[in-house]
A protein has these predicted regions:
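Left-handed beta-helix
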Residues: 5, 10-11, 16-17, 22-23, ...
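C-terminal segments of enzyme domains that contribute to small-molecule binding surfaces
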Residues: 6, 10, 60-62, 66-75, ...
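Phosphate/pyrophosphate-binding betaalpha-module
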Residues: 39
Length: 173
């Protein structure tokens, strides 16, 4: 994990083009961010877990606001992900979609093109449908995950974790 300014980016992550990283952003192993067609802006403490893809359409910038957590292998191709939203593992947000603040997109959810999701919505399914309002407990969980990943990124950057191949036998754990 390398530190770039106040952000943390895994050594094998690809960040190219017009991409703005705010303080505390943490981009994990195998992520690809392509700001080649329009700007991608990641707000403070955004967490992109392993294998995420973030891209845009030509001339349509994407903003991922403060405190957003994006689960493993999710794809963001939308316009806006509102603050403190959790995008579950493998979820897909298609072109021009706008996700309100404090939402939860369940794992595997597909948000279709140009769809607008209201704030504090729990969205599930293919295509994604709002199933209920996000509770305060749901929101606390998102905030906790964001804080946990930022802490881990800081520890990785300081060398607190072993190399990717792990520890040799007999060295404990």
């Amino acid at each position: 994990m390398r530190q770039i300014g106040d952000s943390y980016v895994a050594k094998n992550a690809i960040v190219t083009g017009d991409v703005v990283l705010s303080a505390g952003v943490n981009i994990w192993f195998g992520c690809v961010l392509r700001g080649d067609l329009a700007r991608i802006t990641l707000g403070p403490r955004v967490n992109l877990q392993d294998g995420c893809i973030v891209h845009t359409d030509y001339g349509e910038p994407q903003v991922v606001e403060e405190g957003v957590v994006v689960g493993h292998r999710a794809v963001l191709h939308g316009k806006l992900i509102g603050h403190d939203t959790l995008v579950g593992m493998g979820a897909i947000v298609l072109s021009g979609a706008e996700i309100g603040h404090e939402c939860v997109l369940a794992a595997g959810t597909l948000v279709t093109e140009r769809r607008r999701i209201p704030p504090r919505s729990l969205v599930m399914g293919v295509p994604g449908k709002v199933v209920r309002e996000v509770t305060d407990d749901d929101l606390r969980r998102t905030l906790s995950i964001a804080a946990h990943y930022l802490d881990m990124a800081q520890r990785y950057a300081k060398g607190a974790f072993p190399p990717p191949w792990g520890r040799p036998p007999g060295e404990g754990g």
